[in-house]
Amino acid sequence: MRLKYLKLKNFRGYRDGEITFSDLTAFVVKNDSGKSTILEALDVFFNDSKGVIKYDKEDMNITCGVDDVVISVGFDDLPNEIIIDATNKTTLADEYLLTKDGDLEIVKKFRNGSTTPKVYIYADHPQNPSCCDLLTKKSSDLKKIVKALNLEDVDLTRNAEMRQAIWNHYRDDLNLSESYVDISKEDAKKYWDKISNYLPIYSLFQADRKNSDNDSEVQD
């Protein structure tokens, strides 16, 4: 996957900002304009405060009047397929986990001063109450829905296939809309566990301190 953009809300000096990236990106601005904040926000996102930068509740922009800090990162050049359930292959598009532009946007929200984020995917996802939460359903729950809808020729051993069959049943009434899909809870957490394996490796080297081969970012 390739880093495409970063969105910051209520993080330090950024109330609501977006930065786009290309194969080579350089920031040329005067001092104290927020260059380091961008790089450090990426470190918090990719390394979960286990890298150089540790997220602190004081990173919240207190002038915004809200308690949530949001770091969102968008990616393109996505894997052709992913395996979520055992050996069951699927795609991010088939699971309605992409934006309208076809990007994967992962969102980490630090709520009410918490230093542990909740993880979401901002995607063009079904809003129909009958099929809006299939990603959180266990296999047994999906089977019940398939049987209740009298869907035929569906492999009941494959969660992805059952989800596709249910969504296809409601294909004319999915009510697609870009929304936050919570992948921090229940079975949806498996998506984050798998998707995180495809994320780029991000290492931040700070020029204003001594760097050595023993640093964790070098050893990793």
Model-derived segments and spans:
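Pre-Walker A-like glycine/lysine-rich segment at the N-terminus of P-loop NTPase domains
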Residues: 1-47, 56-66
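Intrinsically disordered, low-complexity acidic/polar segments
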Residues: 17, 28, 80-82, 115-117, ...
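Electropositive, glycine-dotted interaction segments
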Residues: 88-220
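Conserved P-loop NTP-binding catalytic core
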Residues: 40-102
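Beta-strand elements of well-folded, non-transmembrane domains
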Residues: 25, 75-79, 110-114
